Regions:
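Transmembrane alpha-helix termini and helix-breaking/packing motifs in multi-pass membrane transporters
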Residues: 28-35, 87-92, 148-168, 253-254, ...
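Structural signal for membrane-spanning alpha-helices in multi-pass inner-membrane proteins
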Residues: 28, 83-90, 157-158, 176, ...
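Helix-loop interface residues and adjacent transmembrane-helix termini in multi-pass membrane transporters
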Residues: 3, 34-35, 65, 94, ...
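Helix-loop junctions on the cytosolic side of multi-pass membrane transporters
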Residues: 120, 124, 166-199, 405-417
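A single, central transmembrane helix in multi-pass transporters
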Residues: 162-167, 206, 210-275
Length: 420
């Protein structure tokens, strides 16, 4: 795909995602070691989602009002400076729980503002016929980075600790910002309301009003899109915590394996995203929204495989291998379904609404992260066997597949039949 702007976004995403993957992995281990409790660990992660909830409405309005290149560049420079300052604090040995929490809180704000700008810019720089492949490529290259990141982070964390990882992340944000300065993204079409001051109470009030308007719009005009967004929330409650809460507990605490092994396990899990992104990029016509529920079948198989580990006793490394393969199947499902549904949303929602709808989607998905993390953290701390937890997870996710089939796949089929 010969497209300068798309190439820059892809390279910029590789660089910044590389830093993010390393930081996410290392901070998970850092917090788990620091707190010593799965419940407290999950609570801290849940609190870090609060900025997403608060700033998601503003991010959509911002993305539909300001040039999306400027949003990406300014935020990456800011993150580079913030993490650079945090690296300086770490090197001086002045770190504390308050500082860690503050840095995570501010970074969460930046991620919230950044996401809709990237998502909304893709349809501006890529032709509609190449949109599915473009989203697949972005998903794929990001996934490759996410495979290498945890493995390298596990080695760095085990050998050198958190300090080196934070420095690497600061550099990655700086390089990403420099790359994005060469983007050429046109301004979005503006109405009279978009000329108001961005930093004002009116802007903030209208941003939250836009969130409500997005919901009303989707409920009336795009019910399938609303159902897709609801499925994202369901995944974040009953699926994602397996990788964010259960995985570090199972590998590092229950099996007592080193951080390097956890890095490899997470890398194998993310390999599923590479396979999914590669598959849908080269064979986009194999997948359609009429059968989107099929993409969730590997996820059911993966969680079922993981649940077996709660009832067998074999070599710890063999158990970690089985867990990793189950995670690979989960990520394969998420990769295929996310690219397919994201492309569908981009085609269905008008450009002047896309940023706000993307922000609404992020808000709903993010609000659902905290309950999932808290739920899994608490049930693990209560001493409920991991096998039982995962069997219940399988049941809930079978319900998700049924929901997707009835509310998304069948609805798309009915709409196409009416249009024919």
């Amino acid at each position: 795909m010969r497209n300068k702007n798309f190439l820059i976004i892809v390279i910029g995403q590789i660089i910044s995602l590389f830093g993010n993957a390393i930081q996410r992995f290392s901070m998970s281990l850092y917090l788990l070691e620091f707190t010593g409790s799965t419940a407290v660990f999950s609570q801290i992660l849940a609190i870090s989602t609060i900025p997403y909830i608060i700033f998601a409405p503003i991010s959509g309005k911002l993305s539909d009002s300001v040039n999306r290149k400027k949003i990406m560049v300014y935020l990456d420079f800011f993150c580079a400076a913030l993490i650079g300052i945090y690296a300086f604090i770490l090197l001086r040995g002045n770190d504390s729980a308050l500082i860690v929490g503050t840095v995570m809180f501010i970074l969460s704000i930046c991620y919230t503002l950044y996401g809709p700008a990237v998502t909304s810019s893709i349809p501006q720089i890529v032709d509609e016929e190449n949109l599915t492949s473009a989203n697949g490529i972005i998903n794929q290259v990001g996934s490759i980075v996410n495979v290498v990141g945890p493995i390298l982070a596990g080695i760095l964390y085990g050998l050198l600790g958190i300090k080196v990882i934070v420095i690497i992340n600061a550099v990655s944000f700086l390089l990403s910002a420099i790359m994005e300065m060469f983007l050429d993204i046109p301004d979005v079409a503006k109405n009279d309301e978009s000329t108001e001051k961005l930093v004002s109470m009116d802007f903030i009030k209208k941003s939250f009003g836009d969130m409500k308007d997005s919901f009303v719009y989707l409920k009336k005009e795009k019910k399938v899109v609303l159902a897709i967004i609801a499925s994202y929330a369901f995944c974040n409650i009953f699926l994602v915590p397996i990788l964010s809460i259960v995985a570090p507990y199972f590998i590092n605490v229950l099996l007592e394996l080193p951080s390097e092994i956890y890095g490899i396990v997470e890398g194998v899990c993310v390999l599923g995203m590479i396979l999914g992104g590669f598959w849908i990029s080269i064979k986009p016509k194999m997948f359609s929204m009429k059968k989107v529920h099929y993409t969730y079948y590997p996820m059911i198989a993966g969680v079922t495989l993981m649940s077996i580990l709660g009832f067998i006793k074999i070599n710890n490394y063999a158990m970690a291998t089985i867990f990793a393969f189950g995670g690979l199947l989960i990520m394969l499902s998420l990769s295929l379904s996310n690219v397919l549904t994201l492309t569908f949303i981009q085609k269905q929602v008008p450009s002047n609404m896309l940023g706000r709808v993307s922000a609404f989607s992020v808000a709903v998905a993010t609000i659902s992260v905290a309950p999932g993390q808290l739920l899994y953290g608490q049930v693990i701390d209560m001493g409920i066997p991991l096998g039982i937890i995962l069997i219940v997870t399988v049941i809930f996710n079978i319900g998700l597949v049924v929901f997707i089939k009835k509310r998304v796949s069948d609805t798309v089929v009915e709409s196409e039949e009416k249009a024919a």
